[in-house]
Structures are given as structure tokens and as C-alpha cells.
């Protein structure tokens, strides 16, 4: 399930809620995303994110040096991010 926090239109206000840039409404970041979702680049949706454990910690193999990362890490500026098919 994709969440509001997985959308480029989500603007965080604090640790639990934010504003939808489309509807201008306050929303909870963990609620299900709407059909208008514009998927934000994150490690969890990158083909270079591998070997994730049950806690969402995996390995990035898309950069010069492999390293452990959280699946929820924003990857907007990551040069190695490639969306999964």
C-alpha cells in the first residue's frame, strides 16, 4: 500500500501529518495515497535497493560504494536511483 508520504505532492508539517499540494487538505502521512499519487523516489522503489530485512533496512548497490540504507529514505537527489519496473 502506498501512503501519502510516498507522494511528491505531500508536504510534511510535522512527524505525523502534512498538506496535500493538490487538494490543500491536511492529511496523515500514513494514510493510503489517493489515485493522483506521483510516486516519490525512495530507496524502497529503487532497483538498486537489495537484501531488505523485516525492518526495512537493506543495501544500496547503485552507487560507487555499497552501503546500508533505510527503505523509506528519500532519494530525490540520488544519482543511482532507478525506479523498479
Swiss-Prot record:
Q: What name does the UniProt record give this protein?
A: 4-hydroxyphenylacetate decarboxylase small subunit
A Gene Ontology molecular function term for this protein is:
metal ion binding
Keyword Transmembrane helix on entry: no
What does this protein's UniProt record list under function?
A: Component of the HPA decarboxylase that decarboxylates phenylacetates with a hydroxyl group in the p-position. Active toward 4-hydroxyphenylacetate, 3,4-dihydroxyphenylacetate and to a lesser extent p-hydroxymandelate (2-hydroxy-2-(4-hydroxyphenyl)acetate), forming 4-methylphenol, 4-methylcatechol and 4-hydroxybenzylalcohol, respectively. Is likely involved in the catabolism of aromatic amino acids such as tyrosine fermentation.
Please name the top-level EC class of this enzyme: lyase
Quaternary data: Heterooctamer consisting of 4 large (HpdB) subunits and 4 small (HpdC) subunits.
Write down a Pfam family by its short name.
Answer: HPIP_like
Activity regulation, short description: Enzyme activity catalyzed by the HPA decarboxylase complex is rapidly and irreversibly inactivated by oxygen. Competitively inhibited by p-hydroxyphenylacetamide. Not inhibited by m- or o-hydroxyphenyl-acetate, p-hydroxybenzoate or p-hydroxyphenylpropionate.
Indicate yes or no for the key word Lyase: yes
Catalysed reaction equations from the record: 4-hydroxyphenylacetate + H(+) = 4-methylphenol + CO2; 3,4-dihydroxyphenylacetate + H(+) = 4-methylcatechol + CO2; 2-hydroxy-2-(4-hydroxyphenyl)acetate + H(+) = 4-hydroxybenzyl alcohol + CO2
**Species of the source:** Clostridioides difficile (Peptoclostridium difficile)
| Similarity-based family | Belongs to the HPA decarboxylase small subunit family.
> What positions does the entry give for [4Fe-4S] cluster 1 binding?
4, 7, 20, 34
Amino acid at each position: 500500500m502506498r501512503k501519502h508520504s510516498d507522494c511528491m505532492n505531500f508536504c510534511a508539517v510535522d512527524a505525523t501529518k502534512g498538506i496535500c499540494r493538490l487538494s490543500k487538505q491536511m492529511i496523515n502521512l500514513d494514510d493510503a495515497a489517493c489515485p493522483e499519487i506521483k510516486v516519490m523516489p525512495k530507496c524502497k522503489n529503487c532497483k538498486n535497493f537489495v537484501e531488505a530485512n523485516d525492518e526495512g533496512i537493506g543495501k544500496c548497490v547503485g552507487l560507487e560504494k555499497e552501503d546500508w540504507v533505510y527503505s523509506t529514505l528519500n532519494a530525490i537527489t540520488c544519482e543511482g536511483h532507478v525506479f523498479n519496473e
